[in-house]
Each structure stands twice: as structure tokens, then as C-alpha cells.
Amino acid sequence: QALQRQPAATLVAGATDVGLWITKHTRAVADIVHIGDIDALKQIHNNDTALHIGAAVLLADLADVLGTWSPDIARVLSRFGGVQVRSRGTVGGNIANGSPIGDLAPLLIALNAQLSISGPSDPRTLALENFFLRYGEQDLQAGEFIDSILVPACDLDGFSCWKVSKRFDQDISAVLGAFNLVFEDESVREARICFGGMAGLPQRASACESALLGQPFNRDTLAAAKIALATDFEPLSDMRAT
């Protein structure tokens, strides 16, 4: 209701990033709506088909659950900022912020996550990879907000992810890569590969994926995928050295 009255308001839950807009970048934020204490948005539950994550679930609480899916996921989530950030920052906030170097988006895109979006019109579901339109722009209309994230249950035998940063922890990513391969008869049946820090938004490596699909998982295939990967992105040679 508050958002309907003030559709241009900035939503905050943990405010770990919005706080920096104000204190470090001296941005004027006129209207703020706090959603961090709404119980319906703080729920996280798992069943046989999917993990349902409320938008206001803390990053620390996400790590306790999603981290059990894969040792790689657990390692990446343990390096997310520091203890203070993980204890205040939220899943929905990290996604809605739209940062191209956010740690969650590449990982969740590789896991085929879906967003549940509420607003003045009917609720809608959107693939996370389609949420990011271009640098600084996300698919949210006035008065809309992310209410939850759904991660389908899947076989993670072919899943891996890693983070590169100047410090091991308490640092933002220079590059984060997430790789989710499904094998059948020693060939690659499905491939979802996503990077953060390689473009103006979290983005799948479509050429690399195509080079892997239907191919035997061997050195020759990986060499071809490596060549294809070089065509997927044109990273900036900026201060983050991506």
C-alpha cells in the first residue's frame, strides 16, 4: 500500500547499498519504504521441486540453506562482503540493485532462478536472466517490487562457481563465474554459464554454451568452448581490472 501511494519510492530492507548512496555518493533519496520487517518476505523454504526465497531473506540465512546444495556455492556465499553485510543485506536487495558485479545474480542465473514480482497489476513471474535489461536498468515498472525468488531443484553434479576479488573476503567481485552443466551419455545436454563483471549486466555466455551443447566433455570440447567464450563479452579495462 505504501508503494502504491509512492510508486517512485526507494525500497530498502538491509540498506547496505542504499546507505552508501547517501553517505558516500551524497545522493538525495526522497521517499524510502522499509520492507525488512515484513514476515512474508523473510521466509525461505525448500521442497522437492524448488527453493522459495523471500526477497527480504538475509544473505546469511540464504547461505545456511543454499550453501548446502554445493561446496562451491557455500564458498562463494561465505565471501559475500563481511559478516556485517551478510547479517543485514538481503537477497532481493542484491538482485534489485542491478549491479553487474553483484555476487548473487550470476550464481542464481546459472541455477535458472525465477523472480516473483508484485505490484499494482497482476503478479508476474520473470526469469532472472531477463530482469537485467542494460546497465542500470531492470525490468521493474513503477510500483512493482520483487517479492520472492524461486530456484528449481536440480542435479548439481556439473555445477561450479568461483569469485575473483582483490581481497579474499570483505570485497566486491572483479569477476564471478557460475557454470551449470548437465551430462547425458558423457555429452553435454544442458549448459548454463553466467558471468558477473564481464559486461554492464550479469550475462550468460551464449557462444560458450553453444560450443558445449551436444559435445563430448573432453579437452577438445573445452578448447572450443574457451575460444567461443572470448566472443561472448567485451569487458571494460577499468579500475576493477576485469
Question: Which residue ranges define each predicted feature?
Answer:
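C-terminal structural segment of proteins
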Residues: Q1-A241
